Amino acid sequence: MTSQWKCPAKDQSLRNIQRNRRRLGDSGLPATVVRCSKSGATRRNPAVNDASQCSSIVSTVRIGGKDGRHQPKLQSRVLIFELEDKSLSTE
């Protein structure tokens, strides 16, 4: 079953990022920050390390790791995650 994530509300984004990161567990791999164009909200999700896993991405920034390289920016209006992992669904 696929769960779809849209951008969180701007005022909740940082708190949700921290809570979700703890809940999902930090695997030590570089996480990906995905930015939504409309609200400017970001979501940091250790499970999404590849832009191809998301159906539409505004911009992704690679954080962590030694190189700190940026992933290519893709133009889009709405951010929707389509992941197979059921643990990522909102409660």
Swiss-Prot record:
<keyword id="KW-0539">Nucleus</keyword>
<keyword id="KW-0805">Transcription regulation</keyword>
<dbReference type="GO" id="GO:0005634">
    <property type="term" value="C:nucleus"/>
</dbReference>
<protein>
    <recommendedName>
        <fullName>Transcription factor znf27</fullName>
    </recommendedName>
</protein>
<comment type="function">
    <text>Transcription factor; part of the gene cluster 27 that mediates the biosynthesis of asparasone A, a sclerotium-specific anthraquinone pigment important for sclerotial survival. Controls the expression of the non-reducing polyketide synthase (NRPKS) pks27.</text>
</comment>
<keyword id="KW-0804">Transcription</keyword>
